[in-house]
Amino acid sequence: MYKTIDLFSGIGGIRLGFEKYGCTNVFSSEWDKYARQVYEANFGEKPFGDINGIDPSDIPDHDILLAGFPCQPFSIAGKGLGFEDTRGTLFFNIAEILKTKQPKAFLLENVKRLTTHDSGRTFRIVLETLKQLGYTVYFKVLNTLDFGLPQKRERIYIVGFSDNIPFYFPEPINQYRPLGELLENDRDVEPSYFLSDTLKQKRLAALKKAPPTPSIWHENIGGNVSALPYSCALRAGGSYNYLVVNGVRRLTGREMLRLQGFPDDFEINIPYSQVRKVAGNSVSVPVIEATRKICSLLFPARSNKKGNWIYWRQDDA
């Protein structure tokens, strides 16, 4: 049984993906009160608050560290591209825990922009820090659209092992569920979700071609409207208001969580405005599930006749 900790946990999407494969979570941390409220309702425990308020040595021993950490700039005073450059950021908390607890593996998730942030310097510091801590590190940008969900959402995933273990990221399945399977019937949606006739006509007039059905309409800052058979990336900020189902209504809270791969029995116990935020900040569960091979790689699966350990490889999937 593998033990995990869930840092910057949000509503628990990473944990959910790993628990499906037998992992037991022993510690969680999240500062947003609404995300903590949802997390407690679904996992039976309230995450620790601000990670800055806990000593890394007080965190339980674990095999895998899981974290979806914020993208922050590092100090321009740093010259070494390493651990000391990360002080004052939330990534430093992750590095401190890795240094203190030395788990066998980690999975980190971040926005794709991390790779180019500060002309790539931020990402170089992250990778160098992890390597300085003794980990073999792998990274890749994965798109939710390639793993079964109708949402175009690119995120960087960073995997590390304390041993020199070969790792291969999952290959895209190159298909996704039809959008219509995730949308609720308009007849079952409350009237408050529907747009006024004026807004509907405005967006319809901005379309350059006939929309597919069903579709999610996205209006960018410039006022251009596109209608797609999948959703653009769910976002926590105000731009989220520009995603409209078939040009007539907003996404419901349940639809948002479905677009992130959460099951329908996942409880929603916070206001709609906060559901938009926590859903936009969450991870896509199927992408996390696709990285489950981390568990298989942690410990030798079997030995061959010569006594050498054989590890799970990509072609064993």
Swiss-Prot record:
The active site is at 71. One of its GO terms (molecular function) is DNA (cytosine-5-)-methyltransferase activity. Keywords: DNA-binding, Methyltransferase, Restriction system, S-adenosyl-L-methionine, Transferase. One of its GO terms (biological process) is methylation. Its EC number is 2.1.1.37. CDD domains: Cyt_C5_DNA_methylase. It catalyses: a 2'-deoxycytidine in DNA + S-adenosyl-L-methionine = a 5-methyl-2'-deoxycytidine in DNA + S-adenosyl-L-homocysteine + H(+). InterPro entries: C5-MTase, C5_DNA_meth_AS, C5_MeTfrase, SAM-dependent_MTases_sf. The keyword Methyltransferase applies. Belongs to the class I-like SAM-binding methyltransferase superfamily. C5-methyltransferase family. This is Type II methyltransferase M.NgoBI. It comes from Neisseria gonorrhoeae.
